[in-house]
């Protein structure tokens, strides 16, 4: 509260500054009104030239630029920016969040700062909440920008990279937060500079900024590749979960969305599985399957959190009510739901690239946003994004009547009252917008309305294709619209009908488009708009007389902002309107907290079920519940950010290194340092004991022989008098550098050798960098999963995560150096037009990318080389599914960028994606986010057979690691536990105790 007061202390001063800017624009408005279309368009070139001369800044140009946009909007859209919209545009340009009430024209406001900042030529991004709004705004608001000579682009999920790159090259680019974020991650997985699509992060305007930066910030963006195939455990635990009784065998805390198994439940599970101890180390993975199956049973409800269509589980976004097509929960949650619903269980995934929305948006040099509900989260915007919130006055006074909540004892009684209220309003011609919290409840209410004979439209996740059309008609006389939360954002509800929507629909029917036929579209626009305005004018007056739009909420949301967004649909631009919430003690929000106490009071007072109550106790309980949930969610978002700060610093280092390589940087000196550092690590490790007679020189020579063709004769060095570690290091470093010179000469003939080696360095370093980074992400995921347990040992989990994460990053960087050096000395290279050069490759690089040692060391045992987690590489690594034994060989490293030189590195040639990448984006709760599948084809993985099930049951024939060939560290453990070998029987600590 104190911080809120501090943040609001300067509001009056800021508003006075914004009002002064609006007055400046008004003073010069007539100067622009008198310009011809060509002269007005020519102002863009003049502004750019004045910027290029360096004598004026964007702030200096603001009044004139805003006046130009205001006039262009009047000529193209038939809309003139109000003074409060000019104020909002100035607030956005200055890097603030403009809080503007629903119906105040936020979309039109965005044209002002986007035009001004696009003059700098660095690109402007406009971020919306869904693809429909991005396409719509790019077309409609793009008319203003195109009229002024700017280019406008829009990105959507299925757009190919060349087209996507062209859209980013435009002056202004529209798209969703997920698309912008995933493009950033994909750019940092690119194989060549030609594949990059984004051109920097200059200025962004985020529409519905609270939804994107607050509601959706609990889940990071993740690109993942195929991991293991699903096992039978999902089906097994889907069978067991219904046998367990809530509050007896397990406990549920809905507020935190957690489940906890009790001793009774553990005994029942052990009995069902036929095992002695569920928490024995070999059975540890089963606990995760059990928890997910119980969450699927209790916390994920069909037709609320997801729907099942054509044998597929589709997530429903809690905040918008939309179906998130192709998206999936991560960490096995989606598979557990699929098993519960008895549909096909699809495979899990492993992280390849990730970033939180908080850290993505902090990449922008300047960030701004607009929404109707931001002041309640002003402190969070300030703390995390350094954004101020400026409440912009409404153009006309708000006259909406917000009625007090009414509370019923049961949900059935509540809906009966809702139907009666709707029927009465409909009979007198008042339009009604009903907000529900789930698909299930919207369809239940629709069924009740049909019984009552009330005509209505239903807008929920199953009918989102008609969203815009339904909402545009929701303000018509007597209209009744039942909608999930998706109705709250993006499309304006105008009393009597939306003339702009009607005009656009008419022009579309005539085959006109603002993109494809801009001249014909603009010529026909004014006539179509005026015709539509006349058609709705009379009806508008009738609806106003009936009381305006009536917004009826059937349940309170966890967040006050979501409730305010629903209320805000009524009373736009000074129109009459009314709102009311109907509640019951069975509502989700009430059940999360102490609704039982209120129910007890109603029972003692003998209040009938169909009689509502209006009590300060209930009002306080609701307010308290919402405040608690908002506080919990804020802590979740802060916690996500704290942990991602560790990854963000590491990600910045890796991505900067990749960009340097993609940019064609000369890595020669850096690779030379790699050679020296790797050799030094070998020598220091072998000579750590101090005295020469205690040095492990045999191991040193073996390791060096596997690294590069050693020229130093070992006996000569071993027998030297007065040998020191420093002398030994110097001799070997000189020898390694000379070997590198010879390697460069061997790869080319004369002047061609150097460019070939430089290209090889870039390819190898990029391939190793990508592989090691993927492995590191896997390790960091594993670390974060269990780091919370450190609190039991009185240690701060975050501090432990920071410390261990740094150590792991240092280890990864050393591994990048070592593997790069090994590959540069040993990998097979072929230049177009030459015979294939067989340069000391004893194993198949195309499979492992870990070459055998040179011939001189061919008989020495190969050192362990870190491998990619089984099936975890990008889709470019995907191969036809092979038997499990064959798949224990790790896949090849990431493809690397193509280059001007026709150089081919066996096992490292770039290949195009074949499918399998998945994208995790913000979802319905603070837990696992959904994953978007671009190509649904299966990737590599290990099918779970009967051996896996019998292993946990303790039956005869349980697979155990044998004494033969050891699996790769990241391959599935042969015991059938479902864990990686290195985390199961490959764990040295475990082997030592068995």
From Swiss-Prot:
Where do the annotations place ATP binding?
85, 103-107, 492
Textual note on the cofactor? May bind 1 zinc ion per subunit.
Q: Name one GO biological process term.
A: protein targeting
Query: Which annotated residues bind Zn(2+)?
Result: 973, 975, 984-985
Q: Where is the composition biased (Low complexity)?
A: 868-888
Biased composition of type Pro residues is found at 889-900
Q: Which GO terms describe its cellular component?
A: cell envelope Sec protein transport complex; cytosol; plasma membrane
What this protein catalyses is: ATP + H2O + cellular proteinSide 1 = ADP + phosphate + cellular proteinSide 2
- Residues of the signal sequence? none
Quick check: keyword DNA damage in the entry?
no
- Domain of life the protein comes from: Bacteria
Question: Which cofactors does this gene product need?
Answer: Zn(2+)
Q: Name one Pfam family in it.
A: P-loop_SecA
Keywords, comma-separated and alphabetical: ATP-binding, Cell membrane, Cytoplasm, Membrane, Metal-binding, Nucleotide-binding, Protein transport, Translocase, Translocation, Transport, Zinc
Question: What does the record note on quaternary structure?
Answer: Monomer and homodimer. Part of the essential Sec protein translocation apparatus which comprises SecA, SecYEG and auxiliary proteins SecDF. Other proteins may also be involved.
**What job does this protein perform?**
Part of the Sec protein translocase complex. Interacts with the SecYEG preprotein conducting channel. Has a central role in coupling the hydrolysis of ATP to the transfer of proteins into and across the cell membrane, serving as an ATP-driven molecular motor driving the stepwise translocation of polypeptide chains across the membrane.
Q: What is this protein called?
A: Protein translocase subunit SecA
Q: Which lineage?
A: Bacteria, Bacillati, Actinomycetota, Actinomycetes, Frankiales
């Amino acid at each position: 509260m104190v911080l809120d007061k501090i943040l609001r202390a300067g509001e009056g001063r800021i508003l006075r500054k914004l009002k002064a800017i609006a007055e400046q624009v008004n003073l010069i408005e007539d100067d622009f009104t008198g310009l011809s279309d060509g002269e007005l368009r020519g102002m863009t070139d003049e502004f750019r030239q004045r910027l290029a001369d360096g004598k004026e800044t964007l702030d200096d140009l603001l009044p004139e630029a805003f006046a130009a946009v205001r006039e262009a909007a009047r000529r193209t859209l038939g809309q003139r920016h109000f003074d409060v919209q000019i104020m909002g545009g100035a607030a956005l340009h200055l890097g603030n969040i403009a809080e503007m009430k629903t119906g105040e024209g936020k979309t039109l406001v965005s044209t002002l700062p986007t035009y001004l900042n696009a003059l700098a030529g660095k690109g402007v991004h406009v971020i919306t909440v869904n693809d429909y709004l991005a396409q719509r705004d790019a077309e409609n608001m793009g008319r203003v920008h195109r009229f002024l000579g700017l280019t406008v682009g829009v990105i959507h999920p299925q757009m190919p990279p060349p087209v996507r790159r062209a859209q980013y090259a435009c002056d202004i680019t529209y798209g969703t937060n997920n698309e912008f974020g995933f493009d950033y991650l994909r750019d940092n997985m690119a194989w060549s500079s030609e594949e990059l699509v984004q051109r920097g992060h200059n200025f962004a305007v985020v529409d519905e900024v609270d939804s994107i930066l607050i509601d959706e910030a609990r889940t990071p963006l993740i690109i993942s590749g195929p991991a293991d195939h699903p096992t039978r455990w999902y089906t097994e635990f889907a069978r067991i979960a219904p046998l367990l009784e809530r509050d007896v065998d397990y406990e549920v805390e809905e507020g935190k969305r957690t489940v906890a198994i009790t001793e009774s439940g553990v005994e029942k599970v052990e009995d069902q599985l036929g095992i002695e101890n569920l928490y024995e180390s070999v059975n540890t993975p089963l606990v995760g399957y059990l928890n997910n199956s119980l969450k699927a049973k209790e916390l994920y409800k069909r037709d609320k959190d997801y729907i099942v269509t054509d044998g597929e589980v589709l997530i429903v976004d809690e905040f918008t009510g939309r179906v998130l097509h192709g998206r999936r929960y991560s960490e096995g949650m989606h598979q557990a739901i699929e098993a519960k619903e008895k549909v096909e269980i699809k495979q899990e995934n492993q992280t390849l690239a990730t970033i939180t929305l908080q850290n993505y948006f902090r990449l922008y040099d300047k960030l701004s946003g607009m929404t109707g509900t931001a002041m309640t989260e002003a402190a969070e915007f300030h703390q995390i994004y350094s954004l101020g919130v400026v409440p912009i006055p409404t153009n006309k006074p708000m006259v909406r009547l917000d009625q007090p909540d009414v509370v019923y004892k049961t949900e059935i009684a509540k809906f009966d009252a809702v139907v009666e209220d709707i029927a009465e309003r409909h009979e007198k011609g008042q339009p009604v917008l009903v907000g529900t919290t789930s698909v299930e409840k919207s369809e239940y209410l629709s069924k009740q309305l049909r019984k009552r004979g009330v005509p209505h439209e239903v807008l929920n996740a199953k009918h989102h294709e008609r969203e815009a059309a339904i909402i545009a008609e929701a303000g018509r006389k007597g209209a009744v619209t039942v909608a999930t939360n998706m109705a709250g954002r993006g499309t304006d509800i105008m009393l009597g009908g939306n003339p702009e929507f009607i005009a656009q629909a008419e022009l579309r029917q005539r085959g006109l488009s603002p993109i494809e036929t801009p001249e014909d579209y603009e010529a026909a626009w004014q006539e179509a708009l005026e015709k539509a305005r006349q058609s709705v004018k009379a009806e508008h007056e009738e609806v106003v007389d009936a009381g305006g739009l009536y917004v009826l909420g059937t349940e309170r949301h966890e967040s006050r902002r979501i409730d305010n967004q629903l209320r805000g649909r009524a009373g736009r631009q000074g129109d009459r309107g009314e709102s009311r919430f109907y509640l019951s003690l069975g509502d989700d929000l009430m059940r999360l907290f102490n609704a039982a106490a209120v129910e007890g009071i109603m029972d003692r007072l003998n209040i009938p079920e169909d009689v509502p109550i209006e009590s300060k106790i209930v009002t306080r309980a609701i307010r308290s519940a919402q405040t608690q949930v908002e506080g919990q969610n804020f802590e979740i978002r802060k916690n996500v950010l704290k942990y991602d700060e560790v990854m963000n610093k590491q990600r910045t280092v890796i991505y900067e290194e990749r960009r340097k390589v993609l940019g064609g940087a000369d890595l020669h000196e850096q690779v030379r340092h790699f050679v020296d550092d790797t050799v030094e690590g070998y020598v220091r490790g072998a000579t750590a004991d101090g005295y020469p007679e205690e040095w492990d020189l045999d191991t040193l020579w073996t390791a060096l022989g596997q690294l590069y063709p050693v020229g130093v004769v070992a006996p000569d060095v071993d027998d030297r008098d007065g040998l020191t570690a420093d002398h030994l290091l110097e001799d070997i470093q000189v020898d390694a550098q000379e070997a590198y010179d010879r390697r460069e000469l061997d790869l080319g003939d004369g002047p061609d050798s150097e460019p070939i080696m430089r290209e090889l360095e870039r390819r190898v370093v990029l391939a190793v960098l990508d592989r090691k980074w993927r492995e590191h992400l896997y390790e960091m995921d594993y670390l974060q999963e269990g780091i919370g347990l450190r609190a039991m040992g009185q240690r701060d989990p975050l501090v432990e995560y920071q410390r261990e994460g740094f150590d792991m990053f240092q280890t990864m960087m050393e591994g990048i150096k070592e593997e790069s050096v090994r590959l540069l000395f040993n990998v097979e290279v072929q230049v177009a037009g030459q015979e294939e050069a067989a340069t000391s490759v004893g194993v198949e690089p195309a499979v492992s990318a870990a070459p055998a040692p040179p011939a001189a060391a061919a008989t020495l045992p190969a050192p362990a080389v870190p491998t990619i987690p089984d099936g975890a590489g990008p889709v470019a690594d995907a191969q036809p599914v092979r038997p499990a034994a064959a798949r224990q060989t790790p896949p090849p490293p990431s493809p690397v960028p193509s280059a001007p030189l026709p150089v081919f590195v066996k096992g490292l040639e770039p290949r195009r994606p074949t499918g399998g990448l998945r994208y995790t984006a913000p979802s319905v709760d603070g837990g696992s986010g959904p994953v978007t599948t671009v190509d649904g084809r299966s990737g590599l993985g290990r099918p779970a057979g009967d051996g896996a099930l019998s292993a946990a049951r303790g039956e005869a024939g349980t697979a155990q690691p044998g004494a033969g060939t050891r699996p790769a560290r990241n391959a599935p453990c042969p015991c059938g536990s479902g864990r990686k070998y290195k985390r199961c029987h490959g764990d040295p600590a475990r082997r030592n105790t068995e």
